[in-house]
Amino acid sequence: MTNEQTDTDVGIIGGGPAGASMAAYLAKAGVKCVVFESEIFPRPHVGESLVPSSTRVFRDLDFLRVMEDSKFPRKYGAGWTSAAEAPVYDHDWDGLGELDAHVDGPNLRFEERDQPGVNQIYTYHVDRGKFDLLLLQHANQLGAEVYEGVRVSRVDVNGGPPAVKYNIAGRETGTTCKIVVDASGRRTLLGNQLKIRVRDKVFDQFAIHTWFENYDRTTWNRNESQKDFIFIHFLPISNSWIWQIPITDRITSIGVVTQRKNFAKTRESREEFFWESVGSRPDLLEKLRAADQIRPFREEGDYSYAMQQIVGDRWLMVGDAGRFVDPIFSTGVSIALNSSRFAHRDILGALETGNFTRAAYHTYESTIRRGTKNWYDFIQVYYRLNVLFTYFVTDKRYRLDVLKLLQGDVYDADEPEVLAKMRSMVSVVEESPAHPWHKLLNDLTHDAFRPTF
Ligand SMILES: Cc1cc2nc3c(=O)[nH]c(=O)nc-3n(C[C@H](O)[C@H](O)[C@H](O)COP(=O)(O)OP(=O)(O)OC[C@H]3O[C@@H](n4cnc5c(N)ncnc54)[C@H](O)[C@@H]3O)c2cc1C
């Protein structure tokens, strides 16, 4: 290990899932690391439904036991509902055969596909206040130093040992480290500072969400095994949907997601907007009106972006600090955890060799870019032509390939075949006005977003 003199080996900005898992990985490997978190945990946070690829990280970090003891609702799969059933099943498609008579529409159970390295058929829905606190405490127990209530103002990254700067009692002070990890989430501390953040030109979604008690979420279950599924309810408004995520037996998180152009301008009208949107699904409205709202509404705005660079000399970005892709498939926490899983290996290598240049983090950079690109392409096709997703899920030849993506297994070297197939189908539908699905195309263009890096 290099014997360069700094206050700590690795400075980590942010103690959410990305920062806490990074700290836990490094501390477990005996690396001296410090987390600076601006909030005092527990604090509320959006992003409550996990995907199963998170389990590998929990297992690596000896954290699965904590997840089990905490009694978070188990998530066995996902279901989708729409106001009127789209004409999914009536169309024939060259290359897709008879639909499998045994599948029961647009829902999936994780147990249908074995996942290497994941030995349970469920993942979890989490109260993020509690989950993030537990993971950060776990990192601390493994040996990471954790400072809450410390907001990092900037990082000096000029090629030499980075200095993490923050104010204590009105005075700027700092900590030097060999490598700095930005895990500041959508605040993207380093991305803003270095001016390398690129707004996503395709996705400009907004969300408004809250928690309800005594909402009868079983209404949507087709059978008992779907208890505690996540449900995505489509609205008859372009690119708009509602999430339904179990938080406890009695509490359910509900969020409306829509495009910027649909979103209300003022706070009051946003609450009205929430209820009007829910009202476009009278079946949902009736159930929610009968329930008790137990938290104020929270909003998340225009959140999709990428970075021109996610690693540099002596710095790395993990989780949302490096990229945000639309959350329709509950991907964010899994990407955050897995980015730390991949990145910490390169950091260990750099500390061992003393080579802290950008090249030292190449494996991480290429792996995480590949994974998020797969998610991104999948999400884009999905928004462009929802019906295609349902069609693939109900075709037994493709069902498991789609499930693999939804389980969060997106980091293989080769692009998933099903994505190429979906993309080519979208192109054909776009070019054929007479095609029965043409009128179902949504207004997000299929490949409008072309990263320039
Ligand atoms: C509408 C919406 C719905 C979503 N739904 C889901 C979902 O169902 N499932 C899912 O997996 N994901 C979902 N996500 C995404 C999920 O919220 C994020 O991907 C996830 O929280 C990323 O973790 P992170 O650790 O990178 O960032 P965060 O969880 O945001 O953590 C970053 C931490 O850094 C701290 N911080 C920020 N700036 C500083 C600073 N200057 N100094 C010190 N500390 C700082 C913050 O206080 C915060 O605690 C959703 C996101 C949105 C917007």
Positions of predicted regions on the chain:
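Beta1/beta-strand and adjacent pyrophosphate-binding region of the FAD-binding site
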Residues: 3-16
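N-terminal Rossmann-fold NAD(P) dinucleotide-binding loop
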Residues: 19-20
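Glycine-rich FAD pyrophosphate-binding loop
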Residues: 27-46
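N-terminal FAD cofactor-binding segment of flavoenzymes
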Residues: 45-88
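Feature captures the FAD/FMN-dependent oxidoreductase FAD-binding
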Residues: 81-179, 183, 189
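FAD/FMN-dependent oxidoreductases across multiple families
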Residues: 262-346, 350-363, 370
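C-terminal helical "tail/cap" subdomain of flavin- and related membrane-associated enzymes
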Residues: 345-453
